[in-house]
Swiss-Prot record:
Assembly information from the UniProt record: Homodimer. Heterotetramer of two MnmE and two MnmG subunits.
Main location: cytoplasm
Function according to Swiss-Prot or TrEMBL: Exhibits a very high intrinsic GTPase hydrolysis rate. Involved in the addition of a carboxymethylaminomethyl (cmnm) group at the wobble position (U34) of certain tRNAs, forming tRNA-cmnm(5)s(2)U34.
Keyword match Nucleotide-binding: yes
Organism: Campylobacter jejuni subsp. jejuni serotype O:23/36 (strain 81-176)
E.C. number(s) listed in UniProt: 3.6.-.-
Domain TrmE-type G: 214-367
Protein name: tRNA modification GTPase MnmE
InterPro entries the record matches: G_TrmE, GTP-bd, GTP-bd_TrmE_N, GTPase_MnmE, MnmE_dom2, MnmE_helical, P-loop_NTPase, Small_GTP-bd
GO cellular component terms listed in the entry, alphabetical order: cytosol
Positions of GTP binding: 224-229, 243-249, 268-271
Keywords recorded for this protein, A-Z: Cytoplasm, GTP-binding, Hydrolase, Magnesium, Metal-binding, Nucleotide-binding, Potassium, tRNA processing
Amino acid sequence: MSDTIAAIATAHGVGSISIVRLSGERALEFALKLSHKTKLTPRHATFTKLFNQNNEIIDEAIMIYFKAPYSFTGEDIVEFQTHGGFSVSEVLLEELVSLGARLALAGEFSKRACLNGKMTPLKALNIQDLILSKSALAAKIIARNMQGNLGELLEKIRTDLVKTLAFVETSIDYADDDLPSDLLEQISTMCEENSKILKEIYTLSQSKKGLIEGFKIAIVGKPNVGKSSLLNALLSYERAIVSDIAGTTRDTIEENFKLGTHLLRIIDTAGIRESKDVIEQIGVALSKKSLEDADIILAVFDASRVQDKEDEKIFDLLANTDKKIFWILNKSDLENVFKNTQNKNFIKLSAQKDITLLKEELQNYLNSFDSEGIMVSSLDLINACKISSEAIFRAKGLLEESSLELFAFELNLAINELARFTKDFQRDEILDEMFGNFCLGK
């Protein structure tokens, strides 16, 4: 990390300011050359003109120097706040490169912060998730995670496991000395408690992932029951073609919309029925796949049509799902001839006139999800918690069987999984993969 890196840290486009970030051993040197200053006071904003090597002015900017180790990366950092737009920040970046800086890789500033012990990989992931959060509720949950509760909990578990492993490996080295029975009981209890905590984290995160990622809602029904009209009503604009011709929607249509504080991804599916049309068959297959991926299902039926075999197929399709289903009887402003033989609690509405009741029911259901507690948005971390929990659970069983070598193996597996997120981690290839999806300048 001896080279000095530079990147534009703000989004590209027209705006009032752009920020160019510089980090490394020569950051201060480059800043002094650009500004024609002889010194900079750390953590002070300096208004200055910036010049290229031909002594031509680049811009007037605010320059802030953060002296190592008291900076985001732990290295010397200089941030330049220039006028916004496409050109000025690019010209400044080119000038920094000509002075000897290197263009930063995606996420390289955060990677250096981790390698220099300024943050854990877990906090870096939380920062990235916060940047990418799609709703106020998601941002709130992620910001809470950033306060350290999750990191402290995982580090405590990892530390417990390391201490336990030390006891057990000592016992393996000195095979004649058995572990005391009271210590064995303590270790068994520790394994049980920590496995349970990690299991709660990953199960809670999976069950409530919609609070962060957005809930997926699939609209399903036979052709021509008003699914596309319902989609348009939820979006409050005409997104899907509405026609009396059955089979108009042959592909899935997906759109995002917000309901209160919740981000929703709604999917209008092709009408499910038997068809010889190859294209329509593909659409029906996609519809069934959408149901598997959905968190919530809106099952739509037509109040103005007598229940038939195609309706029965919808009931059968949804009979064994564990997804939340809202049963909707559309076109209820017309003569109602649909017989509720399945005794479903239908929401009666007209998608072309008023869906207020459905929105209220949806919002009440979404609000019932408790946003408190520890939730993880990173799939990698969810998997790490799952792997660690299962390894510790297996270790407990092996301890009871006095298989100490295998116990140590399982504990090592759990420790290594947690260590990727809770402590300074030196395996560059894994960090490269982790931070490769970050923004430039972050």
